[in-house]
Amino acid sequence: MDPVDPKLEPWNHPGSQPQTACNNCYCKKCCYHCQMCFLKKGLGISYGRKKRSQRHRTPASLQDHQNSISKQPLSRTHGDPTGPKEQKKEVASKTETDP
């Protein structure tokens, strides 16, 4: 083993840099090309910027449809609030007249 100059940084030591440039191939040989290729291709770890996912905007025709629905009055599915009171009064009046 050849002695290494102590003044050189570790990334400049002979043999620390691969002789060929990195490429986009994912074969076994290229995955083990260098540490960066191994992390990126072999393990699937990349530290680059993540792409923002675009929110899908609704077309104008659908927005108009939603606006028209919200302007309509809400229908009451629970029944008329005056209904049960009147029924109780009717039941009470029937029981009073029957005896």
Curated annotation (Swiss-Prot):
Keyword Transmembrane helix: no
Annotated Zn(2+) 1 binding sites: 22, 33-34, 37
One Pfam family hit: Tat
Chain sites annotated for binding Zn(2+) 2: 25, 27, 30
Gene coding for it: tat
Record GO biological process: DNA-templated transcription; positive regulation of transcription elongation by RNA polymerase II; positive regulation of viral transcription; symbiont-mediated perturbation of host chromatin organization; symbiont-mediated suppression of host innate immune response; symbiont-mediated suppression of host translation initiation; symbiont-mediated suppression of host type I interferon-mediated signaling pathway
Function summary: Transcriptional activator that increases RNA Pol II processivity, thereby increasing the level of full-length viral transcripts. Recognizes a hairpin structure at the 5'-LTR of the nascent viral mRNAs referred to as the transactivation responsive RNA element (TAR) and recruits the cyclin T1-CDK9 complex (P-TEFb complex) that will in turn hyperphosphorylate the RNA polymerase II to allow efficient elongation. The CDK9 component of P-TEFb and other Tat-activated kinases hyperphosphorylate the C-terminus of RNA Pol II that becomes stabilized and much more processive.
Record PTM: Asymmetrical arginine methylation by host PRMT6 seems to diminish the transactivation capacity of Tat and affects the interaction with host CCNT1. Acetylation by EP300, CREBBP, GCN5L2/GCN5 and PCAF regulates the transactivation activity of Tat. EP300-mediated acetylation of Lys-50 promotes dissociation of Tat from the TAR RNA through the competitive binding to PCAF's bromodomain. In addition, the non-acetylated Tat's N-terminus can also interact with PCAF. PCAF-mediated acetylation of Lys-28 enhances Tat's binding to CCNT1. Lys-50 is deacetylated by SIRT1.
Segments of this protein annotated with the region Interaction with the host capping enzyme RNGTT: 49-86
Residue ranges annotated as motif Nuclear localization signal, RNA-binding (TAR), and protein transduction: 49-57
Region (Interaction with human CREBBP): 1-24
Biased composition (Basic and acidic residues): 77-99
InterPro entries registered for this protein in UniProt: IV_Tat, Tat_dom_sf
Comment text on domains: The cell attachment site mediates the interaction with ITGAV/ITGB3 and ITGA5/ITGB1 integrins, leading to vascular cell migration and invasion. This interaction also provides endothelial cells with the adhesion signal they require to grow in response to mitogens.
Modified residues (Asymmetric dimethylarginine): 52
Annotated stretches, region: Cysteine-rich: 22-37
Protein name: Protein Tat
Organism lineage string: Viruses, Riboviria, Pararnavirae, Artverviricota, Revtraviricetes
